[in-house]
Each structure stands twice: as structure tokens, then as C-alpha cells.
Amino acid sequence: MRFAGHHGPPGHRRQRYMCVPASGEPAHRFTELLPCEESWTDACETCEREVGLHEGPHAARSYQFVARGIAESLRAVGAGSTYRDAALVARERAKRLRCDPVTGEPRFSRHGSLVMDWVEVFAPVVFEPYRPREWPTSGSLLLDDLPFRVRDPDTGRHRVAFRIFAVMGYAAGRPKLWRLEAHTSKSQVDWEAFLGALPGSPPRVVCDNDGGLVNSVRSRFPGAGLYLCEWHLRHALERLMGKIRTEGEHRDVIDELLGDIEAAFTGPTLWTPFVERAHAAGIPRLSEWLSTTGRVVEEQFGRRGQRSTRPVEMPPATSPLDGFINPIRAAVGPRAYGLKNRERTNRLLMLMQLHANRQDDDSDYVRLIRACLEANHGRPNVARRAVIDVGRIASLR
């Protein structure tokens, strides 16, 4: 076997080889299963050795960009970068800027479809080794959803276009983002489908007092202890009292009670006198809430124990989940209008989940992408833009 020239444009040439069989059979040219682009340097900083011109980074067959460039882009969008920004960086690093057809000068392009296609094809590949296989069997499972609003072009009003369901669990006592998925509503059917995607059952679930969510937890995890998030309960009570305050009749007593809500939720010592004062105010809607949902608060005080002795994986609220989902909210919010395909969005969320769990490593991504390509004769196992919405009806609207 010997070198037999190159193919491709200058700066991106790929090596051809000539096979000359010792048996006397006709010689033939070929390229590697994963062809290497020409190296731009004489040494590799990663493996700390000299490299030849033919020992550059690996690329998929019929792909202009190398596996490492794809991996870096996947990590970037998982960390919150937009498709456009990640695509611009990928083109600049790979020196793949398009030329202006008139002047011949390099033309900067921030079109995001390049990286969007990579997310569609390779996000499941890099996510698969880290995909949770079952729900955690210890600690608590924390559930919440992130609503994203977009402007309706017909009415001009903003509405919730979709929600991202998020779950956090504990692995070896450490918090871990367990699952993310986009849904168009937060109905019981959607929550049951989301929770039913994995086998097993956690011992304890913490969530909001939303009817669809609570009913789905009881249906899917009948043996789990259900604990309603104290932050959401307190926030619901504050909203109710805020509405009552606007009516003016009970403004003074509501102002007095509002200042004591946060302290009341610390435990039964302050909760009991707070409830007595609220009932004494003679406000029917407030008394009704305290006689129903307030009983849940009292019952949970007996289960949560003292803060000093409470294990870290037994929180009374979903607030530990906020550290994972707040960056996702910030990254998705400004571009929510453009996320209309549910499956593509879920593949983007795979990368965000890997980033949240600190599992997004360029070298690992490159290794997984190369293994996938090698197993499929140098090409991806799915075609680009195969994930589409039938009939031009957006699946995430």
C-alpha cells in the first residue's frame, strides 16, 4: 500500500491510497473509512507527537467538516450557544467560509442550519451512553416545568407555546438532571407519558400542587411518598392574598398577614398562630384555602423533620432543581419562537442535559461520533433533515 495523491480543495485535502496486491491482482485506489483531512500543523497538541500531512482530524465521508468540529459545536449549543453563533465559530475554525460569487471574497455566514442538522443527527449519538435507564431508587425525584411564551401573529397576544418538563434526582447523594422533554401542555396525559418513559419508581416525589402533575405521579408512582413543594404552596397563598388585597375591604389585615407568610412556612410553631389569625379575619376564600391546602402544609411539617437532621436528598421544595433549569430557561427563552419541531427540540435538550450534568466533553463526543460513523461505513446512521413535521403543522405549537 502506498500514497496515491489527494482529493479535495487546498487546505482540506484528503489522502488517497493505492493497494498493490502481492498476488498480482489489479491495483486499486481507495480512501480510509473515515478519511483524514490534511494536518495544518506538524504536531498534535492532544497526543503530543509529530504528525504527517495525512494524519489530520477524521471526517465523515461526504462531510466537509471533521468530527472534532462537530463535537465542539454540539458542546457549544448544549452550553447555551445559539445555532447561528455555533455555526459561525465552526466555519471560522474549519476555514470553511463561503466565497462571494461576485467578488470571490470570503463571506461570513451565520445561518444556523449547519449546526441544527448536526444536533439532529449526532445529539442522540453522544447522549446514548449517558441516558438514564430507570428512575432513581433512592432520595427524591423533583419535578417541574418551564413554560415558554411566544407572540401569536394572528391575535398579537403572547401565549404559552410549549413547556419543558424537567426532573432532578440523586445519584450517590449528588443531584443530577435526570430527564428533559418538551410538551405542548401540562395535562395529566402528557405528564404520564413523560414519567412512563423510564421503568422503576422513586421512594419520594416533590412537585407543584398542579392537578395534572399530582394525578400523574399518583398513577405512575403509587408507592412513592408525595410531597408538595413548599415554595409553590407559599407562592399560591401569596397570590391568593394579593388578589384579596386588591378588593380593598381586607387590605389592612392582608398587609399584616403577608409579612408573616415566609416565617409561617418554617414550621408548626409559627404556622399555627398564623392560621388562627387568618381565620379570625373572617375572609371566606382565605379560610377555605387554609382548611384544604393548608391542612396539607400542616401534615407535611410532621414528615419533613428538622433542617439540621434532614438528608440533602430529602428537600421540602423543588428549589434544588432551579440550579439546573435556570440556565436552560435563559438559553431557550430568547429563541422559543423558532423552536417548532418537538423532536429536534428534544435532541437539543439532550445536549443541555449533558452540559448540566457536566458530561459534555469534546474528546468523548469525538470518540462517540467516530464510533458511530465507523459502524455505518463512514456515514451517519440517519440522514440530515429526516426529522420533519408532516403537513407543515408545527409539533410544538
Task: Give the residues covered by each predicted segment.
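Short, intrinsically disordered, charge-biased short linear motifs at domain edges
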Residues: 2-10
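Short, positively charged, Gly/Tyr-enriched micro-motifs
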Residues: 8, 14-139, 145-152
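Short small-residue beta-strand/loop micro-motif enriched in glycine and branched aliphatics
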Residues: 29-33, 56, 173-179, 335-337
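RNase H-like nuclease fold core
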Residues: 83, 95-207, 211, 215, ...
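Short coil/turn segments at secondary-structure boundaries
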Residues: 88-91, 131-138, 289, 302-306, ...
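Short amphipathic alpha-helical surface patches that mediate protein-protein
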Residues: 91-95, 120, 291, 295, ...
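Extended amphipathic alpha-helical interaction segments
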Residues: 199-206, 211-361, 376-385
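A short, flexible helix-boundary coil/loop motif
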Residues: 359-397
